[in-house]
């Protein structure tokens, strides 16, 4: 004990003599010392940008430096993830997603990044409810009736998604596994073309994030037969959850969190995480997210790391069962 104490004292004195202790303290206290680049690995628009911009606005105020969103789409998010994994400026972070963290590792033979080693989880920012939808002409009013119809006519019903491995693809395959039904998958290149065909009645069903379809539900152009949330949404109080309709424990949400490169000092990560927690509780952020039925979270780095691990375990068997491969 005496030896350890003496060593620590000598070490501290050496640092102090060299002028390093004050510099280290100042470096931790002054982060961020410039604008923070918040990379979104998808094209502008959609749930990812809604979450990123809602949090960035509040983070800019809390941190005293601009936090700006930079969209870098491509390769199912792999391009941006690889770039940020190599970033060493201490002021670049990225929006982590169910796809880049819990799906891509199991559908791509090789990734240009390691989701576990190349990043430090900062905070789970928000969850975006997945809604299960049908065209109004389909003779079903709820999920139970939809599943009954699918079982009665196996292979006759179809559903669309924004592409292989997309959140909508996963949501429907997860539902198929939970309900032991077969529904034909029709992949599209993006949510837009998928919604066009669903609205036109060329598709029977789909699962889509709430922000993209709330307007169509409200106007009766699409029918929501279930939500993937654990509780009913305030925006859709008459629509029961999947769990309520006979599949207890079922939950399907798209989720978004902040990641930092593994090279970022832990002190900066912790400061950023604390700011994220505050940002996601701010009235302005809550109001922004509520308009699109998104649910604010704002957890700690440890909580986000545990959540990612749980999601990876959940989606690996779903991906294997459905034999999902990238487009």
Feature annotation, model-predicted:
Residues 1-7, 11-22, 26:
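N-terminal secretory signal peptides
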């Amino acid at each position: 004990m005496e030896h350890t104490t003496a060593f620590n004292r000598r070490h501290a004195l050496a640092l102090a003599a060299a002028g390093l202790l004050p510099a280290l303290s100042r470096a931790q206290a002054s982060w961020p010392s410039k604008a923070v680049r918040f990379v979104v690995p998808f094209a502008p628009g959609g749930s990812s940008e809604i979450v990123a911009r809602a949090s960035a606005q509040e983070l800019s105020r809390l941190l005293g430096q601009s936090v700006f969103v930079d969209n870098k789409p491509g390769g199912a998010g792999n391009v941006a993830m690889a770039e940020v994994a190599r970033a060493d400026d201490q002021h670049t972070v990225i929006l982590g997603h169910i796809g880049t963290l819990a799906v891509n590792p199991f559908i791509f033979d090789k990734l240009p990044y390691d989701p576990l080693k190349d990043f430090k989880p900062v905070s789970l920012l928000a969850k975006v409810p997945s809604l299960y939808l049908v065209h109004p002409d389909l003779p079903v009013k709820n999920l139970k009736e939809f599943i009954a119809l699918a079982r009665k006519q196996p292979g006759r019903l179809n559903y669309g998604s924004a592409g292989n491995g997309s959140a909508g693809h996963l949501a429907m395959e997860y539902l198929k596994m939970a309900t032991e039904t077969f529904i034909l998958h029709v992949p599209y290149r993006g949510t837009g073309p998928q919604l066009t065909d669903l609205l036109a009645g060329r598709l029977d069903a789909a699962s889509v994030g709430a922000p993209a379809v709330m307007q169509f539900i409200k106007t009766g152009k699409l029918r929501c037969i279930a939500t993937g949330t654990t509780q009913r949404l305030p925006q859709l109080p008459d629509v029961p959850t999947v769990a309520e309709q006979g599949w207890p424990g079922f939950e399907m949400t798209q989720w978004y969190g902040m990641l930092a490169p593994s090279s970022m000092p832990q002190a900066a990560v912790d400061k950023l995480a604390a700011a994220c927690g505050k940002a996601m509780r701010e009235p302005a952020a809550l109001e922004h997210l509520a308009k699109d039925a998104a649910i604010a979270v704002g957890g700690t780095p440890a909580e986000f790391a545990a959540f990612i691990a749980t999601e990876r375990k959940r989606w690996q068997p779903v991906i294997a069962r459905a034999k999902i491969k990238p487009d």
